[in-house]
């Protein structure tokens, strides 16, 4: 679900949230666009009026630690506390310096049971550009080249096309996901 925000969430990370009560999904959302509501806000907004009373008995699953600071939107950790959810499952800690464990601490300080690290590698891979930028203070670098079967860039005799329609499409997809070329 978080991957739905691929084109529009950046420079923010892609985040998904699912609210579950006794094995039934009662709310879900993702971070659609930078500067707009985060995944948790959208998940709570999707809960039917008839199910709102179930929130105190529900678990919210989030792919990235809920934010704990004011930016363009209020802190999601505060919203989770206000909604009365008693259990939060977090995919991975947010590497952004203004969050970096503070959202988890805020939830735990409010008496909420928090589990961290569920599908952690997958959640980090989804936001690898965000993680590299925040942890290594540099852009995520991706290399692309095309070569012949014997390791050359062309056959040396005549112009040739080395890529297939599929790889051309794949390259355009990767370029669309990249901030710079």
Region roles according to the model:
Residues 33-45, 163-171:
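A short, polar/charged loop-to-alpha-helix boundary motif
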Residues 22, 65, 93:
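Cofactor-binding loop segments of dinucleotide-utilizing enzymes, especially the Rossmann-like FAD-
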Residues 1-8, 25, 51, 56, ...:
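Zinc-dependent deaminase
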Residues 1-36:
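Flexible, acidic/Gly-rich N-terminal and inter-domain linker regions that tether
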Residues 30, 37-38, 60-79:
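Local cysteine-cluster metal-coordination motifs and their immediate loop/turn environment
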Residues 43-70:
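Mobile, glycine- and charge-enriched loop segments
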Residues 16-18, 62-63, 144-148:
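Short beta-strand segments
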């Amino acid at each position: 679900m978080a991957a739905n925000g691929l084109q529009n969430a950046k420079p923010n990370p892609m985040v998904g949230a699912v609210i579950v009560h006794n094995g039934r999904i009662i709310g879900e959302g993702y971070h659609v666009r930078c500067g707009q509501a985060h995944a948790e806000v959208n998940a709570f907004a999707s809960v039917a009026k008839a199910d709102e009373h179930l929130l105190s008995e529900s678990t919210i699953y989030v792919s990235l630690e809920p934010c704990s600071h004011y930016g363009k939107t209020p802190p999601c950790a505060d919203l989770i506390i206000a909604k009365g959810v008693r259990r939060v499952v977090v995919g991975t800690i947010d590497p952004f310096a203004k969050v970096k464990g503070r959202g988890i601490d805020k939830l735990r300080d409010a008496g909420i049971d928090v589990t961290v690290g569920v599908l952690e590698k997958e959640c980090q891979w989804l936001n690898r550009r965000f993680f590299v930028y925040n942890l290594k203070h540099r852009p995520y670098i991706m290399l692309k080249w095309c070569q012949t079967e014997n390791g050359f860039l062309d056959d040396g005799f005549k112009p040739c096309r080395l890529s297939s329609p599929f790889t051309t499409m794949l390259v355009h997809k990767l370029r669309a996901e990249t901030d710079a070329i």
